[in-house]
A protein has these predicted regions:
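Expand to "…catalyze enediolate/carbanion chemistry for C-C bond making/breaking, isomerization
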Residues: 1-116
C-alpha cells in the first residue's frame, strides 16, 4: 500500500469480513490493501487475529524483499463516537493490523479521541 502511494500510483483495497476464509481468499490477490470490516459484526478478537495471520503470505513477503505485507491489513473498528471505544483500535493494532479505519467521526472531539 505504501509503495503504491509513494510511487504516485493508485492503491486499491477491498473490504472483507474478519474471517479466516475471507483472509485466505484475499491473501494472494493483487489488492494493495484489505480492510477487515468489524464495524457491523460482533467484535471477535480471536477471529480477527486468525484472519490477520491467514492473510500473511510469507513466501510473497520473502520474495518482495520488504517486510510490508501485500495486501496491507486494515481494520474498520466499531463506532468510536459517543462510546469512546479506542480499545477496539488498540486491540486490532496489537493483533497485527497496519491501520485503522474510523467510522462516523464527525466532530473534532471524536477525531482527537480516535488518535489519543
Amino acid at each position: 500500500m505504501i509503495g503504491a502511494l509513494e510511487s504516485g500510483k493508485p492503491a486499491f483495497a477491498a473490504f472483507a469480513p474478519p474471517e479466516p476464509s475471507a483472509a485466505l481468499d484475499f491473501a494472494g490477490s493483487a489488492y494493495d490493501g484489505l480492510v477487515f470490516e468489524a464495524e457491523h459484526k460482533p467484535w471477535d478478537a480471536v477471529n480477527l487475529r486468525d484472519s490477520l495471520q491467514y492473510l500473511l503470505d510469507r513466501r510473497r513477503i520473502f520474495e518482495s524483499g520488504t517486510l510490508a505485507p501485500s495486501p496491507t491489513p486494515f481494520v474498520r473498528v466499531p463506532v468510536n463516537g459517543a462510546e469512546q471505544g479506542q480499545w477496539h483500535a488498540k486491540q486490532a493494532l496489537d493483533l497485527g493490523a497496519y491501520g485503522i479505519v474510523w467510522p462516523h467521526v464527525s466532530r473534532v472531539e471524536e477525531a482527537r479521541n480516535a488518535v489519543a
